[in-house]
Each structure stands twice: as structure tokens, then as C-alpha cells.
Amino acid sequence: LGLAQTELLIRTEKLEAKLVTALAASEPDNVKAQLDCADLEVISGDLDAAFNRLIECVRRFAGADRTAAKDHLLALFQLVDPADPRLKVARTSLASALF
């Protein structure tokens, strides 16, 4: 968990939550905004929102953007206790979105 947490903190330390959230809402196809917003949702403790946001990106995006959303989601999964039921639901949803 240590490395994944450190990476998350580094990614979010200079983000302004209100600006990122507004950008993600106004530009749903902006993959960077969606990834940043998901990071902030994790930091604030809203795992469900972060997971759902990125799973929706995997469903909607194609190519490199889809891969970026999937990889980012998998990195966020590393922050969560494997026994957490939200993780199981998110993994199942991701599998469904991928296939």
C-alpha cells in the first residue's frame, strides 16, 4: 500500500479540487480530468464514485484513453483492502466493461 499511496499523494498534491471537479463535469471526454477527479474522490474517501467514474470511462473511451482509465483504476485498486466489498463490485464491473 505504501508506494500506491505515495503515488496518489504526489499526483494530487497540486490539484485544486473545485477546478478539477468542474472540469471533469464539463468535459466528460477529457481523460486526464476524469483520472484526476477519481484521484481526488479516493483522497476524500469516496471510493465508489472514483471506481464508477473510471469504469464508465473504460466503457465509453477507446484506444489509449481506455487503456489509461483501466490502468489508473487498477492502480487505485491497490489502495483498497482486498476484503473490501466495494473492490469486488468494482472488479466485477470492470470485467463487464472490458468484455
Where are these regions (language model features)?
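Structural register within alpha-helical repeat arrays
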Residues: 2-5, 37, 57, 73, ...
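Alpha-helical adaptor scaffolds
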Residues: 1-35, 39
